[in-house]
Amino acid sequence: MRNQFDLELHELEQSFLGLGQLVLETASKALLALASKDKEMAELIINKDHAINQGQSAIELTCARLLALQQPQVSDLRFVISIMSSCSDLERMGDHMAGIAKAVLQLKENQLAPDEEQLHQMGKLSLSMLADLLVAFPLHQASKAISIAQKDEQIDQYYYALSKEIIGLMKDQETSIPNGTQYLYIIGHLERFADYIANICERLVYLETGELVDLN
């Protein structure tokens, strides 16, 4: 009986990691669509967001079934609760990437664009944080989770610097307001995306240590 339960817990973790990988792939495509202003790719990202939503629902149903039908130990409870909470964060992260794709559709050519290099670095760091987290999670590496979450401070710095630049450009040139507004949405989505990564890092620390920490 216990062996079967352990197998189900392993399958649950694999489903969670698969959802995380799907979010990572979606984020990569969203940032590529942004860099290339590829509206066709942006449309595809928006249309496929339901796959992430379905993945979240399936994982939550599995968690509920395991809690209701099995007799989990304390460590099992921590694991299932951590997965359930974290998959909700992954779903929201997918929503933010769909939000970036929607903003790409609204961008006008030959109008305001902020520091592309800084925006690229912000996106690149967000992707690396999620990729590192997906490696650390199955290993239950709390120390790695803490170091990943600490990178959110750099994301915030990018956000504030880009916000200041974009608002300044919008003030100087009224015609830049439509694009500027969309870029403010974009960097806001990236900032929240990284915040959710930090949330999952907190759950990974809880999973290993049983301690509730604030890393965000």
UniProtKB/Swiss-Prot annotation:
GO terms for biological process: intracellular phosphate ion homeostasis; negative regulation of phosphate metabolic process; negative regulation of phosphate transmembrane transport; phosphate ion transport. Keywords: Cytoplasm, Phosphate transport, Transport. Plays a role in the regulation of phosphate uptake. One of its GO terms (molecular function) is protein homodimerization activity. Belongs to the PhoU family. InterPro entries: P_transport_PhoU (IPR028366), PhoU-like_sf (IPR038078), PhoU_dom (IPR026022). PANTHER family: PHOSPHATE-SPECIFIC TRANSPORT SYSTEM ACCESSORY PROTEIN PHOU. One of its GO terms (cellular component) is cytoplasm. It is found in: Cytoplasm. This is Phosphate-specific transport system accessory protein PhoU homolog. Pfam families: PhoU (PF01895). Its main location: cytoplasm. The keyword Cell wall biogenesis/degradation does not apply. Homodimer.
